[in-house]
Amino acid sequence: MNETEQAALAQLDRLNGAQELHAAVLALLLPPGSQRALRAWKNECAKLPHIRQVLEWVGQLRANARLPLFETLLSRMRGQPLTERQALLEATRRVMAARGILRPIDRLHWIAMRQRLGESSPAETRAAATSELSQLPESAVAAIASYTAFLARMVPTEADALEDTAPTEAGLTWYAGVMAPWAKRAAIPPCDPPDTEGLVQALQELQSVAWMQRPALVRAWVEAAVLHGRLNDTAADALRLSCSLLDSPLPPELAWHYGETFSETLA
């Protein structure tokens, strides 16, 4: 990370006020090159005196520095009044909708925001005597298949066109690799990404899986992904957001993707 990036990250890390956090969180969600989303962001943040500076600072960050900062600022936003948190969620919905097409990563950002800001709660966790994933009930395996199929739109690669809702060939291969351990027990469903309701239902089922089994699932996702080469930023962000939603630590291969940016600068 060069001095310009370090300075921008340090400035953004000083933000604490509701309006500043509001603007920075939204800026971190902007899709690269989207003029519609940028106009929507400017409309949402027009009252902030230093709006241009916030956008410039965010623009100076590397892609793999954005999600860790997003998580930090969102945690601070949780300490703001309920009206401020609700205003951020409403603004997020408008900015995300400005393009007319919602990216898969946008859906994960949205779910993570609702959970971190206290708008939704994880499902109650079941107990388990082992971390072995082969012992999971059929309902959990079905949820793994559904959620993994959703991730396959981003991991290990994305489709070139946002309109294409099907996973890439690499995504299909990754899905098959993740689901292979259960193939001996039952037929594995095809890689069919769920809609938003199905995604939320699958996530809630996974959140109820025992705490010692969730890290094993996350490791399976990451280990299958790195077989295709170094993680790209979208794939890494999708997996990191999933770790957060499942309250699971980052596997080393995933932590490495972010380790040379945010943590060292703010240590």
Predicted segment positions?
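Small-residue-enriched hydrophobic alpha-helices in membranes
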Residues: 1-97, 101-267
